[in-house]
């Protein structure tokens, strides 16, 4: 069975948590960091994922993809695409699969195009591997968090990415909701049992800013209202700082860093560092060596100047807070706590502005970087049959109004608003339609465009329901359809079946207070009831990838994983050969000199020289098999000599051990002899004393 694990997919860094050892633990990566850069890079031999992509990013800027969560499920013609383009260093194009975004990169020396879903899947595959190596267990079930403003299309794309990576997305959860669940679970001892505590959760991340108002008590949570600014985050602060210095350097040094992607990226990296320094200091230097054209740049910025630069951003902080409170139907005075998370909440100006808007002190009792991941891991554990967890019920906030439409027949309506904005989910509604058959279609749509991000497609999904057969002599039959806004926020039709009227007898119960004659016959009445007749066939066309395309992506990802593994194994074999050459050469004239004949030394020295020359010339970029063959050729002689040396060393150790044992035995024998001698002396002394006393006694009788 899979170890339950949760993933907080951050735009800049990702945090993994797993449920084990009766608790929730953060999973560290290969360099022992508690978060992993959300990056995918491509090279001429293999891919770079996470930490390795970060290490290569500056030199491989044109083939490194970041901001993964911003483009997954995003249509290429969406207005947000134009906003996102400036944050990417690779060309973004329209893909032919679903009209979404693809990235163009150079991989294995050829040009490739990968969809945003594929790119996210590559990264999630790396996350899976990290969790697998750290936990040493089976990893398949995942709870993945996404921004609360994600539409159905984006949520489906995230779920598809999980499947391509070989993961089972047991639940897709809104990010702030996951943190709120963690709050409710891990602070259960501090929560009231009978009445709800009102808590505002504020998440200021790398690329977006979200606010949710929750009602929480022991064992239960409801999200009452939620709002967001999807273009407000740490990267916007970094960009503002970078643009400030780009303008300054153009005037001061006569260089334009916008002309060189690598140069502008270095300015962005330095801007992020400066932002962090100014969170703890009032002034910070800004220096970059040879930023471009061999020009060194130098400047500085004060915290006051930074706040002036980002004032337009700070002025937007109030809107999501006010909207979330309004949607929740409560006032600031009714809030019991304001919990703040997200890396960008550490910026002093952001903290100050949030506190001023609420008019209350902020609480930082949740781990700002890990709260979402831990909440996800708990939610995933709830779906696991192998892990026992404390019961906790939670319901999320439906962000957008959804209606279901069908072809009108007779006098009935042709649509129904089923899941309004502000409703809680998961939620189920059952509708009854009279259909003539043999099939009909139902479509789900967003019906209030003003609630949606501008430019969002209204269509969600379409279902064809077939197998409808009216009763003989009737033109239509009642059809019951179960509509569902499921735990992952997907809008679905769970089931459909026809029903027919049947007359059944129902016992007539005596009225309250009426005397009952126990000998009287029971009285029945005939009533009409709807009884299930036949299950109907449901075919769905949703934003999820069709099975054939999903399978093709799964196979492509598996192929790239094998390619990466081969490159990794080849590099390991190359390093093994190199280390062996240096080890033998260093020891052949020292430790091993007495264990090899002159002929063996001469032969091995020649082989070592040839192997080294080959390794740094023709063998610089060779195959795994050739590295193994070269190693085995050297080892066939070297290991014999090494074996003689080790045998002699073992013999010396054995002789030393025997000598030590003999010395210890002799010392023990000497000690025991001394003890016996001392014992004899004591006995002799004791016997002499007794004799003397006897001789000195005088009989007084």
Curated annotation (Swiss-Prot):
Biological processes annotated in GO: maintenance of unfolded protein involved in ERAD pathway; protein folding
UniProt main location, coarse: cytoplasm
PROSITE patterns attached to this UniProt entry: HSP70_3
Entry keyword set: ATP-binding, Chaperone, Cytoplasm, Nucleotide-binding, Stress response
Disordered: region residues: 651-701
Keyword Chaperone found: yes
Family: Belongs to the heat shock protein 70 family.
Protein name: Heat shock protein homolog SSE1
């Amino acid at each position: 069975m899979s170890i339950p694990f949760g993933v907080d997919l951050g735009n800049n860094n990702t945090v993994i948590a797993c449920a084990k050892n009766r608790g929730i633990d953060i999973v560290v990566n290969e360099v022992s960091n508690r978060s992993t850069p959300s990056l995918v890079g491509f090279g001429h031999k293999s891919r770079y994922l996470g930490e390795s992509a970060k290490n290569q990013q500056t030199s491989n800027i044109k083939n490194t993809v970041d901001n993964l969560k911003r483009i997954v499920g995003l249509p290429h013609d969406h207005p947000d695409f134009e906003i996102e383009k400036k944050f990417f260093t690779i060309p973004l194009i329209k893909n032919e699969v679903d009209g979404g975004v693809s990235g163009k990169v150079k991989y294995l020396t050829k040009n490739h195009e990968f969809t945003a879903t594929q790119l996210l899947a590559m990264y999630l595959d790396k996350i899976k591997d990290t969790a697998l190596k750290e936990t040493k267990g089976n990893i398949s079930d995942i709870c993945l968090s996404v921004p609360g403003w994600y539409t159905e299309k984006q949520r489906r794309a995230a779920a598809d990415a999980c499947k391509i990576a070989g993961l089972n997305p047991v639940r897709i959860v809104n990010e702030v909701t996951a943190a709120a669940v963690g709050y409710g679970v891990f602070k259960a001892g501090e929560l009231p049992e009978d009445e709800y505590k009102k808590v505002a959760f504020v998440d200021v991340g790398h690329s977006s800013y979200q606010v949710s108002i929750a009602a929480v008590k022991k064992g239960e949570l409801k999200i009452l209202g939620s709002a967001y600014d999807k273009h407000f985050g740490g990267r916007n602060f970094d960009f503002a700082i970078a643009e400030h210095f780009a303008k300054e350097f153009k005037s001061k040094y006569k260089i334009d860093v916008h002309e060189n992607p690598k140069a502008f990226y270095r300015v962005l990296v330095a801007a992020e560092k400066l932002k962090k320094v100014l969170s703890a200091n009032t002034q910070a230097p800004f220096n970059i060596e040879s930023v471009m054209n061999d020009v060194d740049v130098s400047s500085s910025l004060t915290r006051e100047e930074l706040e002036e630069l980002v004032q337009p951003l700070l002025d937007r902080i109030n809107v999501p807070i006010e909207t979330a409170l309004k949607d929740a139907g409560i006032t600031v005075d009714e809030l019991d706590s304001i919990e703040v998370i997200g890396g960008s909440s550490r910026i002093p100006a952001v903290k100050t502005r949030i506190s001023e808007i609420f008019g209350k002190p902020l609480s930082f009792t949740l781990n700002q970087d890990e709260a979402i991941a831990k909440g996800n891991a708990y939610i995933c554990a709830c779906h696991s049959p192998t892990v026992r967890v404390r019961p906790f019920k939670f319901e999320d906030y439906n962000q957008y109004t959804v209606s279901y439409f069908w072809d009108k027949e007779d006098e009935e309506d042709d649509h129904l608003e089923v899941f309004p904005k502000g409703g809680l989910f998961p939620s189920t509604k059952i509708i009854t339609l009279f259909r003539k058959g043999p099939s009909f279609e139902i479509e789900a749509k967003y019906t209030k465009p003003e609630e949606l991000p501008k430019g969002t497609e209204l269509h969600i999904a379409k279902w064809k329901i077939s197998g409808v057969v009216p009763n003989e002599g009737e033109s239509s039959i009642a059809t019951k359809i179960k509509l569902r806004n499921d735990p992952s926020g997907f809008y679905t039709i769970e089931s459909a079946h026809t029903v027919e009227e049947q007359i059944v007898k129902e016992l007539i119960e005596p009225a309250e207070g009426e005397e009952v004659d126990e000998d009287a016959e029971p009285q029945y009445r005939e009533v009409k009831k709807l009884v299930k007749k036949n299950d109907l066939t449901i075919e769905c066309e949703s934003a999820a990838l069709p099975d054939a395309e999903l399978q093709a992506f799964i196979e492509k990802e598996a192929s790239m994983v094998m390619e990466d593994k081969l490159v990794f194994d080849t590099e390991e074999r190359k390093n093994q050969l190199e280390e062996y050459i240096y080890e033998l050469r260093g020891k052949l004239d020292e430790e091993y000199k007495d264990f090899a004949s002159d002929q063996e030394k001469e032969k091995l020295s020649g082989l070592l020289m040839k192997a080294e020359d080959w390794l740094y010339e023709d063998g610089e970029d060779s195959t795994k098999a050739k590295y193994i063959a070269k190693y085995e050729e050297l080892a066939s002689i070297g290991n014999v000599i090494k074996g003689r040396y080790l045998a002699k060393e073992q013999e010396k150790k054995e002789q030393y051990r025997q000598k030590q044992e003999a010395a210890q035995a002799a010392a023990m024998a000497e000690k025991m002899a001394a003890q016996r001698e001392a014992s004899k002396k004591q006995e002799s002394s004791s016997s002499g004393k007794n004799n003397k006393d006897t001789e000195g006694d005088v009989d007084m009788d």
